[in-house]
Curated annotation (Swiss-Prot):
One of its GO terms (molecular function) is acyl-CoA (9+3)-desaturase activity. Pfam families: DUF3474, FA_desaturase. It catalyses: (9Z)-octadecenoyl-CoA + 2 Fe(II)-[cytochrome b5] + O2 + 2 H(+) = (9Z,12Z)-octadecadienoyl-CoA + 2 Fe(III)-[cytochrome b5] + 2 H2O; (9Z)-hexadecenoyl-CoA + 2 Fe(II)-[cytochrome b5] + O2 + 2 H(+) = (9Z,12Z)-hexadecadienoyl-CoA + 2 Fe(III)-[cytochrome b5] + 2 H2O; (9Z,12Z)-octadecadienoyl-CoA + 2 Fe(II)-[cytochrome b5] + O2 + 2 H(+) = (9Z,12Z,15Z)-octadecatrienoyl-CoA + 2 Fe(III)-[cytochrome b5] + 2 H2O; (9Z)-heptadecenoyl-CoA + 2 Fe(II)-[cytochrome b5] + O2 + 2 H(+) = (9Z,12Z)-heptadecadienoyl-CoA + 2 Fe(III)-[cytochrome b5] + 2 H2O. The chain crosses the membrane at residues 45-65, 69-89, 203-223, 228-248. Keywords: Fatty acid biosynthesis, Fatty acid metabolism, Lipid biosynthesis, Lipid metabolism, Membrane, Oxidoreductase, Transmembrane, Transmembrane helix. This is Delta(12) fatty acid desaturase fat-2. InterPro entries: FA_desaturase_dom (IPR005804), FAS_N (IPR021863), Fatty_acid_desaturase (IPR012171). It is an enzyme of class 1 (oxidoreductase). It is a multi-pass membrane protein. GO terms for biological process: collagen and cuticulin-based cuticle development; fatty acid elongation; innate immune response; reproductive process; unsaturated fatty acid biosynthetic process. One of its GO terms (cellular component) is membrane. It comes from the Eukaryota. The lineage of its organism: Eukaryota, Metazoa, Ecdysozoa, Nematoda, Chromadorea.
Amino acid sequence: MTIATKVNTNKKDLDTIKVPELPSVAAVKAAIPEHCFVKDPLTSISYLIKDYVLLAGLYFAVPYIEHYLGWIGLLGWYWAMGIVGSALFCVGHDCGHGSFSDYEWLNDLCGHLAHAPILAPFWPWQKSHRQHHQYTSHVEKDKGHPWVTEEDYNNRTAIEKYFAVIPISGWLRWNPIYTIVGLPDGSHFWPWSRLFETTEDRVKCAVSGVACAICAYIAFVLCDYSVYTFVKYYYIPLLFQGLILVIITYLQHQNEDIEVYEADEWGFVRGQTQTIDRHWGFGLDNIMHNITNGHVAHHFFFTKIPHYHLLEATPAIKKALEPLKDTQYGYKREVNYNWFFKYLHYNVTLDYLTHKAKGVLQYRSGVEAAKAKKAQ
């Protein structure tokens, strides 16, 4: 069956899925040790400092890496910068959610210190990302990676349909496509983009944008005003950081079996249960503050649990979801040492969502696989 095969989605013929009783957020929270909800500012700041030290170490090492290992070493350095840059982003990510500390001023300050150097406008990102957590797996309201329905897909141009299939697209999706150009949620740098509705939002956008511009200018000065050096040692590492971030966020919510819901079927807990913990291995999960393999816990309590408590909270959440383990709503975890190739594979095979039941969508390939299995 080809990528353009149309799946029959006549809504009148769709069954209604009977949803088992799902635990409340309060019930899940009660299963987690209380200290997991404690936000220690000093601990949080220590991770911010740690990531800066790692980045400084990589910059100190790059002349030697390039001298002894040439372009192959430089390519490896770019990947390392992408990983550590994403770790720094994750600290700012805690700041944006308020899980960094109980002090809003400290969260905002450290959030800008973490995000501005990697050209991620803190307050605009905070605004768009919040809606992703509030409406996870909602076909219309979820933000970040847009859900593509069969109708959306059929109305796209060839470039729009197959851009994601091109491997190099991953390096461009975060910066410049998402944050600067503003696809699909609106530019995070332009105060009058559709992302912002109030004067306060626009002022915050301008402040965060200026912070990014200052960091970029400082980098340009440190590069001795050389565009070539600036691109080679500052902007290209940021493209790798954007790639890693895109892969992290994509894999956390994508596989053939996950469900996406229309408004009448969506619920907060039901949506969060479609999140997937992915273990990358090789120490990468730890470097990136367990945002990869502790993401289910983060999604349930994104404003309450700091990243350094996610792994301890995860077994408790798994236990709370244990009665649902044989359903669509159980705890989900995969080991993905092949995370980069998994990402590339999904971009080819997961093209669009189609209805599997009334108000419930699934990727076309998953629906077809289920039908083929049922027909056997």
